């Protein structure tokens, strides 16, 4: 198989940035799928009672990312109150189970008490009517719980938000057996793929040969780039946004709502879940671990290169070599995961409010 070698460049600010799973369009697509699937259901009425006039699952889907800064616009009093009450809210979006593993379980290496599985459990419990501290230690309100479920069901279907890469200095992917082994000396945390770098020009050139060209943007929707374009792209960023764009282009859709309409019309075959809905996050995490093995298939990291953050702190990054057809299987997997996320979001809300 042809290989694409991705060179390393200075990209510290990008490699060290916060992860926003699926990006704006991906999260909106998950919400839009659920909006359409829930029309006319008892759950739709319960959802409407918690949303503000004009809000939909699609429109609130990015709220938990927007509270991390002002890139969505000025923060509302509701956002500021949520951040003040949840100082570790950025940790709610992911878990870091070695991607080679098959299952998530409480206390596993890479898991945490505030990770995505535990946070989803709490939010689902709230909508089930449980408000005791054992079920809801963060004291989420029902509205916050709905917003978090809408967003985090999307996040947990992004493979790199569950399956994490741990790397030796020479670039080998390794499986730490304990948290203590991730010491930054023999075993490094690749930070959800943020410290694994693709050459942006090369991956773009490769995708141009196998992914349909983007449809012309609607008039007035183009925005200038917020930052100078980096010569490298973190693997996490590729999975957050780039593959979503590829997946939408392969379906000839331009907006999240068009994507939702197209995939629902195709009558996608989506695996269901069983048991109490509070156990479903474990099932989703296991499925995402399986997906992360596909995301890392054929991906090879080179030796570590030390860089320095804006705070003057040293850290390591690794240049990647990926299979030459990587945009094709990765965008196919992204399409599947977005569809599964939308259908599972609708299903869990129906299960809570039958």
Could you say what each language-model-derived stretch is?
Residues 1-7:
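Bacterial N-terminal signal peptides that target proteins for export
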Residues 20-152, 159-354:
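N-terminal, motif-rich segments that launch catalysis or mediate targeting to/interaction with membranes
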Residues 16-18:
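N-terminal signal peptide c-region/cleavage motif recognized by signal peptidases
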Residues 7-8, 147:
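Residue-level detector of transmembrane insertion/anchoring sites
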